[in-house]
Amino acid sequence: MPTIQQLVRKGRRDKIAKVKTAALKGSPQRRGVCTRVYTTTPKKPNSALRKVARVKLTSQVEVTAYIPGEGHNLQEHSMVLVRGGRVKDLPGVRYKIIRGSLDTQGVKNRKQARSRYGAKKEKS
């Protein structure tokens, strides 16, 4: 416990907040190459086969990114755009792949929340 005189001399040091998306190096998105595309199971109590990919980013960091939406066309060596955003029931998955950009196609037959999944407006 410092004395008041010590606080007057030195003051308190601010705590530095830890960055949640360190691999993006301050960018909103990063481009990367898929090194492995696979499925994994979520934590309890959920049950599914979640689609994820290991991606080597242009910042030379390899991360695990979630592939949102139903169905995808990704395989090894696909170029993808990665954004921040964790998946709560997949430990270690702190990034998401942006659908509809670079080699990633949008979700087919998507009617609502289309912009999140890179789906074009359907011709009526």
Curated annotation (Swiss-Prot):
It comes from the Bacteria. The modification 3-methylthioaspartic acid is found at residue 89. Transmembrane segments: none annotated. Keywords: Methylation, Ribonucleoprotein, Ribosomal protein, RNA-binding, rRNA-binding, tRNA-binding. GO terms for cellular component: small ribosomal subunit. Pfam families: Ribosom_S12_S23. This is Small ribosomal subunit protein uS12. It comes from Mycolicibacterium smegmatis (strain ATCC 700084 / mc(2)155) (Mycobacterium smegmatis). The gene is rpsL.
